Amino acid sequence: MDAHYTGNKITELRKSKNWTRKDIAEKLHVSVAAVSKWERGLNFPDLSLMEPLSEILEISVSELLGLENESADQV
């Protein structure tokens, strides 16, 4: 797992929905600073937030974490 990959994915999907960091923060009941840290690859979202985050971004947790790409690369 790569925090920068996940952060870039969150940013990409957020922007594709024309959402701000504040929008994501409000949906997940976290601070804007937390979302900023995720997007910059400084932290991962808390495990309890992975599923709700993936649901609002309309992506699987595996895709959000880059796990599907890793398994494809290993084949």
Where in this protein do the model-derived segments appear?
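A short, Lys/Arg-rich alpha-helix, primarily the initiator
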Residues: 1-16
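Short coil turns linking two alpha-helices in DNA-binding domains
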Residues: 2, 20, 31-34, 46, ...
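Short alpha-helical DNA-recognition segment
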Residues: 18-37, 52
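Short, conserved catalytic or interaction motifs in soluble domains
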Residues: 30, 40, 69
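DNA major-groove recognition helix of helix-turn-helix/homeodomain DNA-binding modules
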Residues: 48-63
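Short, charged recognition helix plus adjacent turn
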Residues: 66-75
